[in-house]
Each structure stands twice: as C-alpha cells, then as structure tokens.
Amino acid sequence: MAVNDSVNILNSAYLAVEYIDSFLPDNPLQQPFKNAWNYMLDNYTKFQIATWGSLLVHEASYFLLCVPGFIFQFIPYMQKYKIQPDKPETWEKQWKCFKTLIFNHFFIQLPLICGTYYFTEYFNIPYEWEEMPRWYVLLAQCFGCAVIEDAWHYFLHRLLHHKRIYKYIHKVHHEFVSPFGMQAEYAHPLETLILGAGFFIGIVVFCNHVVLLWAWVICRLMETIDVHSGYDIPLNPLHLVPFYAGARFHDFHHMNFIGNYASTFTWWDRIFGTDSQFIAYKEKEKKQQLRMKKTN
C-alpha cells in the first residue's frame, strides 16, 4: 500500500512538472542542440561518442570550472572570501597538482572512460535524440546520482581516514591543508578508483540515456571543484541545493583532517556526529567576531 502511495505521489509530481513545462516558452537553444546531437550521431560511432565524447566533456568541464578559482588568487577583492587567507596558493603547489592531474586523467581515468561504450551497451543505454529525457527528469536524475554518490563517498572516505591505511592512500589528497579548485581530483590512483566507483552507481540506477552520463559528470565536477575552491563566495547558486555542504564545510575537513567526510550533503555527518568539531569551530568563530565588533 505504501509503495503504491509513493508511486502515485511521484506520478502526480511528474504530471505537475509536465503541466508547468507546457506553459514555458520554447527553449531557443533546443533546436541548435538537437541539430548538433544528430550531426554527432550521423558522423561518429557509438564507441567514439562514448569514449572521446566522455573524455572531452570531462577534461573541458574540469579545467573550465577551475578557471574562476585560479583567477581569484590574482584579485585582491576576492581575498576577503578566501577561507584560509593565511595559506595562499603557490605556483610550486599548483604545478605539482597539475602534473599529478594529467597523469591521473590519462593513465587512470582514460582507461576507465574507454570502457564507457561497453558500459552503455551492457545496460542498453540509448544515444538517440528521441530517447533523451526532459530537462526536469535529467535534473532529478542528477540529484539522485548525487545522493547515492554522497553516501558512498561518506563511508569510503571515512574508511580511508583509518589510521592503518590513511598514510598509504588518502594522505596524498591531504597534502594541501588549504585546498584550491584544481586540487579536487588530486589523489592517489587507488583513491581515484575507490571513491570514483560511487560515481557509477547512480548511473546504473537512473541512466536511461547517455546524456545523463555527461550531465552527471558536469554536475559532479561542479560540486567537487566548488567545495575544494577555498573560497566561500556569496550568492553561490549551489547554496540553493538543499543540505548542500559547500566550500567552508569541506575546507574544514582539509584543515582539521577529522570530520566532514561527505562530498555533497551534510546529513551523513550530522547523523553520525562527525560534524561536531566543525560546529564547535563555527561557534568559536562567531564568538570571536562578536568580540571584535564590541572592541570596534
């Protein structure tokens, strides 16, 4: 009975969104996107689309999303939003990070990306324009992927902090006490495989089109680069996402090494009490700010 009620609620929500969508003006980008998509299908094989298309989406998204944070270090005005202003980025650290990223991207991630075609074939994931989900379905699927990945990340990330294995794998990612955007995927190859596995679970559960794979890549990179940016920017649209952790939450993890293990949302740390030191730290910050206001 409860299952039927849940299904009815979801169906009603879907119909409500479809009804609202029918009143929205036509998207002027839809036709050019459709033409480009069909051109891609007509001129490239599924293997080329799944492999080189996925690589292009990942690399372009990753480095383009890193650009704002990279530029911020040269803008004095933005320094007031830097979470750890006493630990600026250095060229030496950024160059070291970049070299490791290139190695991981092309020697660890590329072989995995080469399996994307076989992944889509095994699960019968379509490529055709006619099978593409509506924007609100795609958005909901990406959110579902984020919820699943966040749960995987919390428990496996916490395991990687165990004293018996931390120094062998996860210590690499913690070389930078004050993170910066490009450092988001700076990790030991084993960590890339272990934590990266959570990315694909949601795809297996929700994926009904290859476009979700690419949309989820972009969403996941947007989130992980944001939380590693080192800047708590006001009016950040990602803060509109319910229970979103954000840069300040994850920055504390790099600064403190303990707690705040989740990747995207705050609920797992709240449930298991692993955000207690972060909460105490925020309270201490508030008291310091109040004292400063009184003295001024």
UniProtKB/Swiss-Prot annotation:
Q: Motif (Histidine box-2) spans which residues?
A: 170-174
For domains, the record's comment is: The histidine box domains may contain the active site and/or be involved in metal ion binding.
The EC class name is: oxidoreductase
Record-stated family: Belongs to the sterol desaturase family.
Q: Which domain of life is it from?
A: Eukaryota
Q: Which GO terms describe its cellular component?
A: endoplasmic reticulum membrane
Arranged from A to Z, the UniProt key words for this protein are:
Endoplasmic reticulum, Iron, Lipid biosynthesis, Lipid metabolism, Membrane, NAD, Oxidoreductase, Steroid biosynthesis, Steroid metabolism, Sterol biosynthesis, Sterol metabolism, Transmembrane, Transmembrane helix
Location of the Fatty acid hydroxylase domain: 145-274
Give the location in the cell.
Endoplasmic reticulum membrane
At the highest ranks, the source species' classification is: Eukaryota, Metazoa, Chordata, Craniata, Vertebrata
Q: Which cysteines are joined by disulfide bonds?
A: none
List where the protein spans the membrane. 55-75, 100-120, 199-219
What does the record give as its pathway?
Steroid biosynthesis; zymosterol biosynthesis; zymosterol from lanosterol: step 3/6
- UniProt source species: Gallus gallus (Chicken)
Question: This chain belongs to which protein, by name?
Answer: Methylsterol monooxygenase 1
Motif interval(s): Histidine box-1: 157-161
Q: Where in this protein would one find the motif Histidine box-3, according to its record?
A: 249-255
GO terms under biological process: sterol biosynthetic process
Q: Name one GO molecular function term.
A: C-4 methylsterol oxidase activity
EC number(s) reported in the record = 1.14.18.9
Primary location class: endoplasmic reticulum
Q: Which reaction does it catalyse?
A: 4,4-dimethyl-5alpha-cholest-7-en-3beta-ol + 6 Fe(II)-[cytochrome b5] + 3 O2 + 5 H(+) = 4alpha-carboxy-4beta-methyl-5alpha-cholest-7-ene-3beta-ol + 6 Fe(III)-[cytochrome b5] + 4 H2O
